[in-house]
Design a protein with these regions (language model features):
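Short, low-complexity, intrinsically disordered N-terminal modules
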Residues: 17-18, 30
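Bacterial N-terminal signal peptides
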Residues: 40-49
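Alpha-helical solenoid repeat scaffolds
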Residues: 22, 53-419
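Generic short N-terminal amphipathic or hydrophobic helices
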Residues: 5, 29-32, 52
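Bacterial N-terminal signal peptides that target proteins for export
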Residues: 28-41
Length: 419
């Protein structure tokens, strides 16, 4: 078959040597060439076939490994991954480590081999359980490098390692950072307090406040109660009761000492409590009382979602002035991204449509534009800026804004601007 193919390619019809004429001096050479080419092509075809089979086997192994990994069957997944090739095997290993299954050496080896893979922050954080089992301070600190622990267990391990090396100030700083920002189970809390109990006495209220803002950490909050003052205990109980819509919420809120009534976290829980009860006028009154400054809000980003909800409700109810004040008083920065952009848009929209104040609207639409980067959002910002400038009588400015918006023809507002 190969001889016939080569014959067609070269313009020769190769036949068996025994049938060649005896006086054809080239027959022997041609036959040798044909045999050599036949052997070469046979080898190439065989190699390609084997590679195809190997790829097929690797793909099948990887599919089996991924299916087992999804089911949490890591024994089967790792065994199947052995036939998935180097890259396929590492994909399964990556998943295994991100599930917190490996030993410290497994994490160290993978991070050294793949320092630029996606999802490494989570992988490294999951490895903190393994780090905590190490008794080598240098190895523990080398694992974290310039990064800070992301778990309570990891923070305890770093504090222990720093103390073992005599780096007491760094140990105290990490203990405070971890205690006030991270989640701890009961065992890790006890371990951290055993290491840095005196230093952390001043941080208990900060930690409890953060736990209450986060929500969903009731067990941690309850463990913190004996470590804080009676006033803070009353405040924490009221905040937890309000968040859970407890029947005792009103009673516990009334029991909060006068000195604690201005707590931003308490104001936030009272606000969301009223929103869930559809008490929108009461909610508006409360949020406007605390929107004059960032400290009064405590955590402006936590308020943002419910704030935007209230703006839309007040707008539909025809309460434009209150809607604008709620939107504009967010106290967010551009760093908050989508929440900042949403509230700036709402403030601008209400100012333009209901307050008939196009200059005020332009200010908010400019703020909106500085906080966005996608074609849809940029087109929306420039379109509404154009509408506001148009209402203000600035035809040239409006045209320029519409032209900018019209650049984005895949966006709804880009198409509107083009009209």
């Amino acid at each position: 078959w190969f001889r016939r193919k080569i014959g067609r390619l070269t313009g020769l019809w190769l036949v068996r040597p025994s049938h060649l004429r005896q006086n054809c001096r080239m027959s022997s050479s041609i036959n040798k060439i044909a045999k050599a080419v036949t052997r070469t092509l046979s080898f190439l075809v065989l190699t390609a076939s084997m590679a195809t089979i190997a790829r097929g086997d690797a793909t099948a192994s990887l599919a089996q490994a991924l299916k087992a990994a999804d089911a949490g069957d890591w024994t089967t997944a790792l065994q199947a991954a052995q036939g998935a090739g180097p890259s396929g095997g590492d994909v399964i290993l990556w998943q295994w480590l991100r599930d917190g299954q490996g030993k410290l050496g497994d994490y160290e080896a993978f991070l050294a081999r793949h320092p630029d893979w996606p999802g490494l922050p989570l992988l490294k954080q999951k490895g903190e359980v393994a780090v905590a089992r190490s008794t080598d301070p240098a190895r523990v600190l080398a694992y974290f490098g310039a990064d800070k622990p992301g778990t309570g267990k990891g923070s305890v391990a770093m504090v222990q390692a720093l103390m073992a090396q005599g780096r007491s100030q760094e140990a105290e700083a990490e203990a405070y950072r971890g205690w006030t920002t991270l989640k701890f189970d009961a065992a890790d809390e006890s371990a951290m307090l055993a290491l840095q109990g005196e230093v952390l006495k001043l941080a208990h209220e900060v930690r409890l406040d953060r736990i209450l803002w986060d929500g969903g950490r009731r067990a941690e909050a309850e463990r913190m109660l004996p470590r804080v003052s009676k006033d803070w205990q009353a405040l924490a109980l009221a905040r937890m009761a309000l968040r859970s819509d407890s029947a005792s919420a009103v009673k516990l809120t009334s029991a909060v000492p006068k000195s604690m009534l201005g707590d931003p976290g308490l104001a936030y829980e009272r606000y969301t409590y009223r929103m869930r009860a559809d008490r929108y006028d009461d909610a508006a009154k409360l949020i406007l009382q605390v929107s004059d400054s960032k400290p009064a809000l405590g955590d402006p980003a936590a308020w943002a979602g419910r704030r935007a909800d209230l703006v839309r409700i007040l707008f539909r109810q025809g309460k434009a002035k209150d809607a604008y004040r709620v939107a504009a008083g967010h106290q967010l920065t551009e760093a908050e991204g989508a929440d900042y952009a949403d509230l700036e848009f709402l403030a601008g929209f209400v100012a333009l449509r209901e307050l008939n104040d196009p200059a005020l609207a332009v200010k908010h639409f400019k703020h909106l534009k500085t906080a966005v980067g996608t074609p849809i959002s940029l087109a929306r910002a420039d379109y509404w800026m154009g509408r506001a400038l148009e209402a203000a009588g600035d035809k040239a400015g409006a045209t320029a804004a519409f032209v900018r918006a019209a650049q984005y023809q895949t966006a709804y507002y880009g198409l509107l601007a083009a009209e």
